[in-house]
């Protein structure tokens, strides 16, 4: 700053920029006066006071956007600027040009005027106010960049930030890779479920969540040692924000790390309750299971050598939820049909309950993969191609019984099989109770089928000979 003497004996404070411009020789200014272009009333380096914040920039930077408010204020060729010369613009006590706007947000406006690019910090909380500043300075391109970031309810949407575009693009590419991997894992062809339709999407995303707490015990007298209870001051939650909000919901305190994107990670959330078992129940209901835990004692200072400081520790529990595939109702219905067909095939191939042990052994021997390769191929074709965590298989896969050392008689096996088939057919025929007349007719038919031979062999048992003598045969 410098003092400029006036004719009345007073003095005026000038900025450094004007002091530099006024230090030029009078001959040079006189030589420039008769030229076709008059010198600009504004210095090359302009000092601005925007809402109490001082900014120093070039005059050409303020004129970089022709139709803006700043260009009309500092351009002498424009109609508005021609009427408003340098002396007519408001100044502060140190003769700097004063603009009554938000001084903190003007830095982003000035940064945009330099290179026509918007670079905001991550999770910028005042995008709506910056939009108002851009509208005031009539920066149409900046307004277009900021407009998608503000919703109709005047709530901030972090996904539209230009500074976060790289994160969104990387996240979108990772999601695309996950979807491609899931699509590649689904088998295709006639054996695939769903007939080549759209596979299930991963609704519940996998991830880790860590619960940490510093626990101690309540201090009581020595004669009440059995009355020491666990005391948990706060349960910390670390992991992805989307998973933490999904599991704990409103019981999650986000005051230490607000305005964070769901796909980001945090280690500053904590729960509003202090019951570990309640947190475990919520994690279990959400499909998480504990994979690791660790604990360590916390050292106390010498002047804090108390029981609650000695018996204190820090513990962490790490929970994980594996990826799960959501199956559509149509695909689930087809899976059930497929399971029924598989169950029927396995039961028909391994039904030995009604037969004896020898028949079961002979059946397993006769149906080995070596003797009947077609049945083995058919059984393997019915087995499901993929196993999901949503619905476990109803029955274990069929295991082939190794053949015995000695082959049993195949005739016995055939007779037992034929008898079992006849009994099954007879049971199916007699499905309802017969009437009295039908029972009598059946008895007469059975009696007529009895055939008494005319001649008995001489070789007979004692009871047989007694019966023949009794009836005189």
UniProtKB/Swiss-Prot annotation:
InterPro entries: BTB/POZ_dom (IPR000210), H1_KCTD8 (IPR049904), SKP1/BTB/POZ_sf (IPR011333), T1-type_BTB (IPR003131). GO terms for cellular component: cell projection; postsynaptic membrane; presynaptic active zone membrane; receptor complex. Disulfide bonds: none annotated. It comes from Homo sapiens (Human). The keyword Phosphoprotein applies. One of its GO terms (biological process) is regulation of G protein-coupled receptor signaling pathway. CDD domains: BTB_POZ_KCTD8, H1_KCTD8. Residues 21-35 have a biased composition (Low complexity). The gene is KCTD8. It is found in: Presynaptic cell membrane; Postsynaptic cell membrane. Gene3D superfamilies: Potassium Channel Kv1.1, Chain A (3.30.710.10). The modification Phosphoserine is found at residues 78, 410. Residues 347-388 have a biased composition (Polar residues). This is BTB/POZ domain-containing protein KCTD8. The lineage of its organism: Eukaryota, Metazoa, Chordata, Craniata, Vertebrata.
């Amino acid at each position: 700053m410098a003092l400029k003497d006036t004719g009345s004996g007073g003095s005026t404070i000038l900025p450094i920029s004007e002091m530099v411009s006024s230090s030029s020789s009078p001959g040079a200014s006189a030589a420039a006066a008769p030229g076709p272009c008059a010198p600009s009333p504004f210095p090359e380096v302009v000092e601005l006071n925007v809402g109490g914040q001082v900014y120093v920039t070039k005059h050409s930077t303020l004129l970089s956007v022709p139709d803006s408010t700043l260009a009309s204020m500092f351009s002498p060729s424009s109609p508005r600027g021609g009427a408003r010369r340098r002396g007519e613009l408001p100044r502060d006590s140190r003769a700097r040009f004063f603009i009554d706007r938000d001084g903190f947000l003007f830095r982003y406006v000035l940064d945009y005027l330099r290179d026509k690019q918007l670079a905001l910090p991550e999770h910028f909380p005042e995008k709506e106010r910056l939009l108002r500043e851009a509208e005031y300075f009539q920066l149409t391109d900046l307004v277009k960049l900021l407009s998608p970031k503000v919703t109709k309810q005047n709530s901030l949407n972090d996904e539209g930030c230009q500074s976060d575009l790289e994160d969104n693009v990387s996240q979108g590419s990772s999601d695309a890779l996950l979807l491609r991997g899931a699509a590649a894992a689904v088998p295709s062809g006639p054996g695939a479920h769903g007939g080549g339709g759209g596979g299930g999407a991963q609704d519940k995303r996998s991830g880790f969540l860590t619960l940490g707490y510093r626990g101690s015990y309540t201090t009581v007298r020595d004669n009440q040692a059995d009355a020491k209870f666990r005391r948990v001051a706060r349960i910390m939650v670390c992991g992805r924000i989307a998973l933490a909000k999904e599991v704990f919901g409103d019981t999650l305190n986000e005051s230490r790390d607000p305005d964070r994107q769901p796909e980001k990670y945090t280690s500053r959330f904590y729960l509003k309750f202090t019951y570990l078992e309640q947190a475990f129940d919520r994690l279990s209901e959400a499909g998480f299971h504990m994979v690791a835990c660790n604990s360590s004692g916390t050292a106390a200072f010498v002047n804090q050598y108390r029981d609650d400081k000695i018996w204190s520790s820090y513990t962490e529990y790490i929970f994980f939820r594996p990826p799960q595939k959501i199956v559509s109702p149509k695909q689930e219905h087809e899976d059930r049909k497929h399971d029924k067909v598989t169950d029927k095939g396995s039961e028909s191939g391994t039904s030995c309950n009604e037969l004896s042990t020898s028949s079961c052994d002979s059946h397993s021997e006769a149906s080995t993969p070596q003797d009947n390769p077609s049945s083995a191929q058919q059984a393997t074709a019915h087995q499901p191609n993929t196993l999901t965590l949503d619905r476990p298989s109803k029955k274990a896969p069929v295991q082939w019984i190794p053949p015995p050392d000695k082959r049993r008689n195949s005739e016995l096996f055939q007779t037992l099989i034929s008898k079992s088939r006849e009994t099954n057919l007879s049971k199916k025929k007699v499905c309802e109770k017969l009437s009295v007349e039908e029972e009598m007719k059946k008895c007469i038919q059975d009696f007529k089928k009895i055939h008494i031979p005319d001649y008995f062999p001489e070789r007979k048992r004692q009871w047989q000979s007694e019966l023949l003598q009794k009836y005189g045969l």
